[in-house]
From Swiss-Prot:
The keyword Metal-binding does not apply. Belongs to the orthopoxvirus OPG150 family. Induction: Expressed in the early phase of the viral replicative cycle. Heterodimerizes with protein A8 to form the virus intermediate transcription factor (VITF)-3. This is Intermediate transcription factor 3 large subunit. It comes from Variola virus. The keyword Cytoplasm does not apply. InterPro entries: Poxvirus_intermed-TF. Keywords: Activator, Early protein, Phosphoprotein, Transcription, Transcription regulation.
Length: 382
């Protein structure tokens, strides 16, 4: 981890990170984080009864447990704004909302109706304007006019699906779905594949998302703010997430180890100089501290900070290159999966930029109308 941050610091005057995803590999020493969190979330409907430590409340926006038989969101109401009458309701026509109408539940309903949650994304995706049923086309070919075509409504406790078809082309379906959600206090309960099954999600107020899988391996999607400047801000954001995450784990699974790790993490946060932060991270790796010793890069992207003011020559790119050009003027390096990968493609990027500058200078110095075709081919295609 420290070597990665050291290199990102070396190039931060030229490149900035965008997407940054990583994993924390499961360790036997820390116990069944997934199982204990699942048990707590499944049995409670108040945020305070899941997250006891009020010091970390401002950092955590929502907890989500997803399985085929139960999808449950627990929201922290205090992290949401007070809505006025003109606040846009995003999702009423997709959901049948059942609530006990208490003050707490009514506030959760208000938030749910206005937040673009994963449930909204899920139901929008499953509502298909048109879908071809190829099985029914086959029936038509082999069965003639007596083939049966389905249209109508089918439903279970949580999902109602309406299928409509045109009499002239009955194998082309229009599908609409409505999902039932039960809202009790801070909980939003339904069923279905609205996220990755058998996962727990912790959504932070800074938009970072932590996904915990059944074996307690974690996938962390680190958010990016416009005001993030350089590697030191990135370290602070990552370790801020660590600090609150580990205190949450200590809260739920009652393992003092996480409180100790949170204290070590806090030393990184309070250090003011980058060199000091990197020294502490290296020390954590040496002592096999959770969060550093089991850190594994998932994928990250870099963007070249400056716009390219010279001609771009796509012919210089390999077919499977991770270097991409956005609108011809923004250079991105995508899907980097290791420090070695990063160093390799940054080096290629730097060399390519220099080659493009040289070719651009030559191209600008010649008369395209009178120059030979072979000469232009050499410049543009090789």
């Amino acid at each position: 981890m420290d070597n990665l941050f050291t290199f990102l610091h070396e190039i931060e005057d030229r490149y900035t990170r965008t997407i940054f995803n990583f994993h924390l590999i499961s360790c036997d020493e820390i116990g069944d984080i997934y199982g204990l969190m699942k048990e707590r979330i499944s049995s409670e409907d108040m945020f305070d009864n899941i997250v006891y430590n009020k010091d970390i409340h401002p950092a955590i926006k929502k907890l989500v447990y997803c399985d085929i038989q139960l999808t449950k969101h627990i929201i922290n109401q205090n992290t949401y704004p007070v809505f006025n009458d003109s606040s846009q309701v995003k999702c009423c026509h997709y959901f049948d909302i059942n609530s006990d109408n208490s003050n707490i539940s009514s506030r959760t309903v208000e938030i749910f109706e206005r937040e673009k949650s994963s449930l909204v994304s899920y139901i929008k995706t499953t509502n298909k304007k048109r879908k071809v049923n190829y099985g029914e086309i086959k029936k038509t070919v082999h069965g003639g006019t007596n083939a049966n075509y389905f249209s109508g409504k089918k439903s279970d406790e949580y999902l109602s699906t309406t299928v409509r078809s045109n009499i002239n082309q009955p194998w082309i379906k229009t599908i609409s779905k409505r999902m039932r959600v039960n809202i009790i206090n801070h909980s939003i309960v339904t069923r279905g594949k609205s996220s990755i099954l058998q996962t727990i999600e912790i959504i932070f107020t800074n938009r970072t998302c932590v996904k915990i899988f059944k074996d307690s391996t974690m996938h962390i999607i680190l958010s990016k703010d416009k005001d993030e400047k350089g590697c030191i801000h990135m370290i602070d954001k990552l370790f801020y997430v660590y600090y609150n995450l580990f205190l949450l784990f200590e809260d739920i699974i009652q393992n003092e180890y996480f409180k100790e790790v949170a204290n070590v993490v806090n030393h990184v946060l309070t250090a003011t100089a980058l060199d000091e932060k990197l020294f502490l991270i290296k020390k954590m790796a040496k002592h096999d501290v959770y969060g550093v010793s089991n850190f594994k890069i998932g994928m990250f992207n870099l963007t070249f900070i400056k716009s390219l003011d010279h001609t771009v020559f796509p012919s210089l790119l390999d077919e499977d290159s991770k270097i991409k050009f956005f609108k011809g003027k923004k250079l991105n390096i995508v899907a980097l999966r290791s420090l070695e990968d990063c160093i390799n493609y940054v080096t290629k990027s730097e060399n390519m930029i220099e080659m493009m500058k040289e070719r651009s200078t030559i191209l600008n110095s010649i008369d395209i109308e009178t120059e030979s075709v072979d000469r232009l081919k050499d410049l543009l295609l090789k």
